[in-house]
């Protein structure tokens, strides 16, 4: 049975958006789509973080969701956090149209992202290839512009 989820992204500044998730079968890939507005033109890191806690803004969401204790990487890499979804690209109009299919995240089971926080970052994610320690943790993606808790949808 298909599962669906949704996340409304908000931050302290102009960045906001709505991201949808759908998984047709429990061990199948998750489709991720939607749009984010108010971004600077270019690439922005896009990750699922550990906690669904936004009590202190996006900071209380903790680190990237990483139940397998791996190093940070890109969405196509074998060595990656479960929450590593790479980058979204904003055009000159500040809008990023998101369309991703990922086989590591899930809407159920051990890798479920339900109840966790989705974050869009200030800078591009270097996908763990930045050559320093921070790269292997965060991809040097910078501050958290907007976030929201991923919830079950109809």
UniProtKB/Swiss-Prot annotation:
Binds 1 copper ion per subunit. Its main location: cytoplasm. Its EC number is 1.15.1.1. GO terms for cellular component: cytoplasm; cytoplasmic vesicle; cytosol; dendrite cytoplasm; mitochondrion; neuronal cell body; nucleus; protein-containing complex. It is an enzyme of class 1 (oxidoreductase). GO terms for molecular function: copper ion binding; protein phosphatase 2B binding; protein-folding chaperone binding; superoxide dismutase activity; zinc ion binding. GO terms for biological process: auditory receptor cell stereocilium organization; embryo implantation; glutathione metabolic process; heart contraction; hydrogen peroxide biosynthetic process; intracellular iron ion homeostasis; locomotory behavior; muscle cell cellular homeostasis. It comes from the Eukaryota. Homodimer; non-disulfide-linked. Heterodimer with SOD1. The heterodimer CCS:SOD1 interacts with SLC31A1; this heterotrimer is Cu(1+)-mediated and its maintenance is regulated through SOD1 activation. Destroys radicals which are normally produced within the cells and which are toxic to biological systems. Belongs to the Cu-Zn superoxide dismutase family. This is Superoxide dismutase [Cu-Zn]. It comes from Sapajus apella (Brown-capped capuchin). The gene is SOD1.
């Amino acid at each position: 049975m298909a599962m669906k989820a949704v996340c409304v992204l908000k931050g302290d500044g102009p960045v906001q958006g709505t991201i949808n998730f759908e998984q047709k079968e429990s061990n199948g890939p998750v489709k991720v789509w939607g749009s984010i507005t108010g971004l600077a033109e270019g690439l922005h890191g896009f990750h699922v973080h550990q906690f669904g806690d936004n009590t202190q803004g996006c900071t209380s969401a903790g680190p990237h969701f990483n139940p397998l204790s791996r190093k940070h990487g890109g969405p196509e890499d074998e060595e990656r956090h479960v929450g590593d979804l790479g980058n979204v690209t904003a055009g000159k109009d500040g809008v990023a149209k998101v369309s991703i299919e990922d086989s590591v995240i899930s809407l159920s089971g051990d890798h479920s992202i339900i109840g966790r926080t989705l974050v869009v970052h200030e800078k591009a994610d270097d996908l763990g290839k930045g050559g320093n320690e921070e790269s292997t943790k965060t991809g040097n993606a910078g501050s958290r512009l907007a976030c929201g808790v991923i919830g079950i949808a109809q």
